[in-house]
Design a protein with these regions (language model features):
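Active-site/ligand-binding-proximal alpha/beta "capping" segment
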Residues: 90, 166-184
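Feature captures the catalytic cores and cofactor-binding loops of soluble hydro-lyases/lyases
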Residues: 33-34, 38-161
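Short, structured beta-strand/loop micro-motifs enriched in basic residues and often containing a Trp
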Residues: 2-11
């Protein structure tokens, strides 16, 4: 069995270029949560020239709306949200420097093309394993849009968060490859 490949967030172009669709990796470092309501607000703020709550350069956004934390824990269950819900907003944020998105499910051609253009990557987190994902979160802090409740933007410090490369920066798609390989 090969050694775990642990990536340190934030991400450089070289790290993103080294990733291939189907790779399983682990993320450690600072990432952010944001779902569709937060994405909509971020894009509106960009259009209005307002400052962003965090610098997108090299950053990762996890499409998740965590459950409330139990006593003594930094966060509750934190499973992935369907990435396609962010497709209308993702190209704008990628163009602003966002390198990594973490969610579940397929993405639009526009998102795939934008990842290729700006050297980005889309990871799938393990659906149905929200409690496991929460164990990888060492700290969590709401940094923007507290009024959105579970959809507020949070800064997470994670340790070895397991993810799979779905879309690499060459446009390769692990879901499509899997469908081709397992067709009967």
């Amino acid at each position: 069995m090969s050694e775990r490949r642990v990536l340190k967030a934030p991400f450089t172009d070289d790290v993103v270029r080294s990733l291939k669709a189907g790779d399983m990796v682990y993320i450690s470092g600072t990432i952010y949560t944001a779902r569709d309501a937060a994405h909509k607000r971020l894009v509106e703020m960009l259009a209005d020239g307002q400052p962003m709550p965090f610098d997108f350069d090299g950053q990762a956004v996890y499409y998740a709306g965590p459950c409330p934390a139990k006593p003594g824990k930094p966060i509750g269950s934190v499973g992935p949200t369907t990435g396609g819900r962010m497709d209308a907003y993702s190209p704008t944020l990628i163009a602003e420097g966002l390198k990594v998105m973490i969610g579940k499910g397929s993405r639009s051609k526009d998102v795939v093309d934008t990842l290729k253009q700006y050297t980005g990557v889309y990871f799938a987190a393990i659906g149905g394993a929200a409690a496991l994902m929460a164990k990888c979160v060492k700290s969590a802090e709401v940094i923007a849009f507290d009024d959105l409740g579970t959809e507020a933007i949070r800064r997470l410090e994670v340790e070895e968060l397991p993810v799979i490369v779905v879309l690499d920066c060459q446009g390769n798609n692990a879901y499509e490859r899997g469908r081709r390989e397992f067709e009967v």
